[in-house]
């Protein structure tokens, strides 16, 4: 078994508005190994996106903890969490969230700029990542000049440019047609093999989830089962 990279210990999340309490996550526990490709499957409102926010240190659990590479996130300062997100984690969303006034190359380079890399390294690494997703010829195009599939590929390149150990993906193909969705998942698998990057994908789509090596099901804020989807149609 691969070394554990990320571990969730009894994560709970409760939101309170006035006298109204809403429990979104209930004692969620699981782990992700180094280089593992995992899917969490659930319908809209099951708590998947909230879980990803906690895993990425974008929100704080009501109770429980997230442990990344042996380090509890509850012990990290806000600055340390930001550094972790920049250096060790990648994020892919259903919507690409590219900066509209910047080129594909500049969008991919943004995490490197934030990480204060050297200018020459920034350009070469960003261009190499665009090449890895098959878009080096679109480096100087803005998002409005790219197709939906191309924009999502740029977003994936941006998520991977710092060579993160884990990528958290929230419905990464939700806005794509079947052909582009298939292409994106082939790309994730290739990057996993070449770079050893671990992927945790949340989705409602069983056809996409079965491409991962492991699948968990989430219902009403609880992990309810480990699925076996290899033969799913």
UniProtKB/Swiss-Prot annotation:
Its main location: membrane. The keyword Translocase applies. The keyword Chaperone does not apply. InterPro entries: AAA+_ATPase (IPR003593), ABC_transporter-like_ATP-bd (IPR003439), ABC_transporter-like_CS (IPR017871), ABC_transpr_LolD-like (IPR015854), LolD_lipo_ATP-bd (IPR011924), MacB-like_ATP-bd (IPR017911), P-loop_NTPase (IPR027417). The complex is composed of two ATP-binding proteins (LolD) and two transmembrane proteins (LolC and LolE). It is found in: Cell inner membrane. Coiled coil: none annotated. Part of the ABC transporter complex LolCDE involved in the translocation of mature outer membrane-directed lipoproteins, from the inner membrane to the periplasmic chaperone, LolA. Responsible for the formation of the LolA-lipoprotein complex in an ATP-dependent manner. One of its GO terms (molecular function) is transmembrane transporter activity. Belongs to the ABC transporter superfamily. Lipoprotein translocase (TC 3.A.1.125) family. Keywords: ATP-binding, Cell inner membrane, Cell membrane, Membrane, Nucleotide-binding, Translocase, Transport. SMART domains: AAA. Residues 6-233 form the ABC transporter domain. ATP binds at residues 42-49. This is Lipoprotein-releasing system ATP-binding protein LolD. One of its GO terms (biological process) is protein localization to outer membrane. It is a peripheral membrane protein. The gene is lolD. It comes from Shigella boydii serotype 4 (strain Sb227). Disulfide bonds: none annotated.
């Amino acid at each position: 078994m691969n070394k554990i990279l990320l571990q969730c210990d009894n994560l709970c999340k409760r939101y309170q508005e006035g006298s109204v309490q809403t429990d979104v996550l209930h004692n969620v526990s699981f782990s992700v190994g180094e280089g593992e490709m995992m899917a969490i499957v659930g319908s809209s409102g099951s708590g998947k996106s909230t879980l990803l926010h906690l895993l990425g240190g974008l929100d704080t659990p009501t109770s429980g903890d997230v442990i990344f590479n042996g380090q509890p996130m509850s012990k990290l300062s806000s600055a340390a969490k930001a550094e972790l997100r920049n250096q060790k984690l990648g994020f892919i969303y259903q919507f690409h969230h590219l900066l509209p006034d910047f080129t594909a190359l500049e969008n991919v380079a943004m995490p490197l700029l934030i990480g204060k890399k050297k200018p020459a390294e920034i350009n070469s690494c960003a261009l190499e990542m665009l090449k890895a997703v098959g878009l080096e010829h679109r480096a100087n195009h803005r998002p409005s000049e790219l197709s939906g599939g191309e924009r999502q590929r740029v977003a994936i390149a941006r998520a991977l440019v710092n060579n993160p150990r884990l990528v958290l993906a929230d419905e990464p193909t939700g806005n794509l047609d079947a052909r582009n969705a298939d292409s994106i998942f082939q790309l994730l698998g290739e990057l996993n093999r070449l770079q050893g990057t671990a992927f945790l994908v949340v989705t409602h789509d069983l056809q996409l989830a079965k491409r991962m090596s492991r699948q968990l099901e989430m219902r009403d804020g609880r992990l309810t089962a480990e699925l076996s989807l290899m033969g799913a149609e």
